[in-house]
Amino acid sequence: MRPLNAAELLKSRSQDHKLAKPQFLSKKKRLELQRAKEDEEREKTELKRKTNTLKRSSPSEPETILDQKDTSTANKKRKKRFNFEWDDEEDTSSQLEPMMAYPTSNNDFLPAEEHWSDKKLEDMTSRDWRIFKEDFSITCKGNNIPNPLRSWKESGIPTTLLNTIDQLGYKEPTPIQRAAIPTALGHRDVVGIAETGSGKTLAFLIPLLSYLSAIDKDYMEVEHKQESNLNKVLGLVLAPTRELALQISKEAKKFASVLGYNVVTIIGGHQYEETVKSVQDGAHIVVATPGRLIDSAEKGLIDLSQCYHLTMDEADRMIDMGFEKALQSILSFLPSTSSSGFGLDSTIFKVKSRITLMFTATISPPIEKITKDYLQTPAYLYIGDAGEIVDNINQKFEYLGDNVDSQEELNAPRTNKMISALRQHIRETEQPLIIIFANFKRTCELLSVELSNQNVGSNIVIHGSKSQEARESAIASFREHKVNVLIATDVAARGIDIPNVSLVVNYHMPKRFDEYIHRIGRTGRAGKSGASLSFVDDGDSEILVNLKSFLSKGTKRLPDWLLRHPAVQSLTLKD
C-alpha cells in the first residue's frame, strides 16, 4: 500500500483543526444544514428503493447495479461505516414493500390488557376468572359452579345483611368466602376444603343469614312465634368442640343482634335449663356439638323437622373424635335432602331441598361417605395448599434421639431447651402469645409449675379434666393477653380462634401427623407469618415420613437429622 502524500496529511490536519474549534451558527445556517441532511437521506432512501426494484425485476443479473456504481465512491463509503459479516444483498429487512399504506401510529405496541380488578363484572372473560382464581388459590370441582365474589357489593347478598357486614368492618372477602358464598346462596351443597383461620365462619354464616331473611315473613312473625313452634330449629351449625361452638356463636350473635335473630348454643358443660330458656326467643340459629344436640333432640328440647339449612364445620375433626355415628343420627332427625320439594314447606322456606354445607381441612374416606350419602351433587371448593402453611410458619425442630419423654416427670434436656427458646422469643417479640402442646395432662401441670418457678412469662393450663367454665375462662384470659402462655393438650388444638399467636411449641409431637398440622395452624393464620418449635425423639418415628413429605412442599431446606433418620429411609409414606 502506497503511503499518503505529506501535502494531503497537512491539508487533512488543517481541516480537522477547524472542526475541533466550536463555531457559532446562526438559526438560518442551522436550518440550511438540517434541510441538506434531510435531502441527502431522502436521496439515499430513493436510490435504495430503486436498487431493490431492479434486483427483483432482473434476478438473473444480481451484479448489474453494483457494476454501474463508482468503485471509488463505494470504497470511501465502506471506510466510513461498520462492515457486517454479511453482504447488503442478504439484508432481508430492506426488501419490504407493503401492498398498501398503513396509517402511522404514535405507539408501536398494543395496549396492555386490562386487569380484572379494573373491569366491570359483566366484562369479565373466562381468562379473567381463571386469573382471579389463581390469585386467590381457589380450585373448584363440580358442574355449574358460580364464579367467586370479587367484592361484597357484587355478591347478591340482601341489602340489610350487606349493611351489617360493612358496619362490622369486614372490608374484603377471604378466598373461602369468595368461593363458598355465591355457591351456597344458590342453594347448592358445598364441600369447602380450607385450613382453620381462613374465614370459614363467615363463609357459612352469611348464606345461613340470607336463607333466614328469605323465609316467608308471615311464618317468621306469626307462626314461628307460637309456643309450639319456638323450639323448631331453622338453621343448624355443628362443631366438634365446645370451644369452636362458642366461637361460632359469638360471631353469629354479632349479626343476629342487628338482624333480629336468636342464636342458641347447645354444648356440654351447660345445663339443659339454659337450652330451654334460650329457645324461648326462637331457635333461629342453633350452634351445637353432636353429642349434646342428640340428647336435646331426644328429650324434645329442640325440633329439627323444619331445619333445611345444615352446616358441619371441621367435619374431619368430628370424624376423628368418633362422631361419625352421631352425625348420621343427627342427619336422620333432619328433613331428607328432597322432602322440602313437596308441600307447603317449599313455599314457606323458599327451597327445593335441604342445603348442606361441609367444611373440612382434609378429605378422608369417612368424609367422602357422608358426602355421598347426605349431600346432593356438591361443589368442591379447595383453598390454597399445604405449601402455604409450610412457608407461612418458620418451623424449627430439636431432635433428641433416643431421649424419649415420659408422663411421670419432665425431661430435663427437653425442658431446658424449651425454656431457653421461650425466653428469647418473649424478649424479641412484642406482645407474644405462646401455645405449648403436650400429650399428657400431668405434663401440662408440671410445665406450668416449672415455667412459674423459672419466671418465664405468665401461663395458664387447659385440658380435658378442666371444667367447661375453667376452660372458657382460660381461653378468654389468653385471648385478652392477661397471660401470654397457654399450656394445652389437643383439646385446644382445633377450633378456638385466637388471633396473633406468635409461637407454637410441641413439647411432645402428636401421635398422628394431621394433629401436627392442626397444632401449628394456631400460628401463621390469615396470611400472617408465625413460628413453631417441635421436640422430636425416636418415639415419633411413625410420623417422620409424613413430616418429611409435608416439609418438602415448602421452599426451605429439610433438617439433616430428618433426611438421615432410619424411619425416613425405610418406611413408605402412609396415605
From Swiss-Prot:
Keyword Magnesium annotated: no
Intracellular or extracellular location(s): Cytoplasm; Nucleus
InterPro entries xrefs: DEAD/DEAH_box_helicase_dom, Helicase_ATP-bd, Helicase_C-like, P-loop_NTPase, RNA_helicase_DEAD_Q_motif
Region (Disordered): 1-101
Motif (Q motif): 150-178
Alphabetical list of PROSITE patterns matching this protein: HELICASE_ATP_BIND_1, HELICASE_CTER, Q_MOTIF
Motif segment (DEAD box): 313-316
GO molecular function: ATP binding; ATP hydrolysis activity; nucleic acid binding; RNA helicase activity
Domain Helicase C-terminal: 421-566
Reactions catalysed: ATP + H2O = ADP + phosphate + H(+)
EC number of this enzyme: 3.6.4.13
Cellular component GO terms held in the UniProt record: cytoplasm; nucleus
Alphabetical UniProt keywords: ATP-binding, Cytoplasm, Helicase, Hydrolase, mRNA processing, mRNA splicing, Nucleotide-binding, Nucleus
Protein role: ATP-dependent RNA helicase involved in mRNA splicing. May destabilize the U1/5'-splice site duplex to permit an effective competition for the 5'-splice site by the U6 snRNA, resulting in the switch between U1 and U6 at the 5'-splice site. May also act to unwind the U4/U6 base-pairing interaction in the U4/U6/U5 snRNP, facilitating the first covalent step of splicing.
Subunit structure: Component of the U5 snRNP complex.
Name of protein: Pre-mRNA-splicing ATP-dependent RNA helicase PRP28
Organism: Meyerozyma guilliermondii (strain ATCC 6260 / CBS 566 / DSM 6381 / JCM 1539 / NBRC 10279 / NRRL Y-324)
Lineage: Eukaryota, Fungi, Dikarya, Ascomycota, Saccharomycotina
Gene: PRP28
